[in-house]
A protein has these predicted regions:
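H-loop (His-switch) and adjacent beta-strand-loop-beta switch element
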Residues: 217-229
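ABC family nucleotide-binding domain
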Residues: 6-220
Length: 229
């Protein structure tokens, strides 16, 4: 397979925390994710799942090794260039939703791009509304997060992740705060984004039922890549 068909490649990836008694979080992790695929990362607590996602998402730098996202070596980007790349290429979905309590669902979805869309806010609002309606939230556009169920809040968070037309969705335990039925709905939704919209999805989960929606599953243990199924 040619290099330009990969959305993510990591080579010899290591991450160590602490200056004194250093704690290794990732040890020599190398993996490749094909563009347009859905990959789940599984493993026990402390296995390095979220650390790996943060490195791929450009939220942190590796201690050593290489991360390439959409053909770009992340280590070569700093400051505004890194932020611009992240905003253009990656959408994030978190376990705790991270919605602003005082903003409506519509405003939360618009928020990431508001500083960059001056004079075009009507187009941004139209895009946000279309996303929310497409996720079944037509009647919730002007509701505050506290007026929404957990599953509805996570769908708002997914719409927010899609607002910038990303190539890659990174979802860190997106069903961890949901009941099993809502969790399954989010799993199916992520699969829809991958299969029907062609987005690459990288999911961290401890739930085998949610991981089953992925094309492949990577297993981590003690910071090491131990298996891929």
């Amino acid at each position: 397979m040619e290099e330009d068909t990969w959305i993510v490649q990591t080579t010899g990836l290591c991450k160590t925390y602490g200056d004194g008694a250093a704690v290794p979080a990732l040890i020599d992790v190398s993996l490749s994710i094909s563009s347009g695929k859905f990959l789940a990362i599984c493993g026990p607590s402390g296995s390095g799942k979220s650390t790996l996602l943060n490195l791929i998402g450009t939220l942190d730098y590796p201690t050593s090794g290489q991360v390439i996202v959409d053909g770009v070596d992340i280590n070569s980007l700093k400051g505004d260039r890194l932020a611009d790349f992240r905003r253009a290429k990656i959408g994030f979905v978190f376990q705790l939703f991270n919605l602003v309590p005082a903003l409506t669902a519509l405003e939360n979805v618009m928020l990431p791009l508001l500083p960059y869309q001056r004079g075009l806010s009507f187009k941004l609002e139209k895009r946000a509304q279309e996303l929310l309606e497409g996720l079944g939230l037509r009647e919730r556009l002007h509701h505050l997060p506290g007026q929404l169920s957990g599953g509805e809040q996570q769908r708002v968070a997914i719409a927010r992740a899609l607002i910038n037309y990303p190539k890659l969705i990174l979802a860190d335990e997106p069903t961890g705060n949901l009941d099993s039925q809502s969790g399954e709905e989010i799993g199916r939704l992520l699969r829809h984004l991958n299969r029907d919209l062609g987005l690459s999805v990288l999911l961290v989960t401890h739930d085998a039922n949610i991981a089953a929606y992925a094309d492949q599953v990577v297993h981590l243990r003690d910071g090491r890549h131990v298996e891929q199924t």
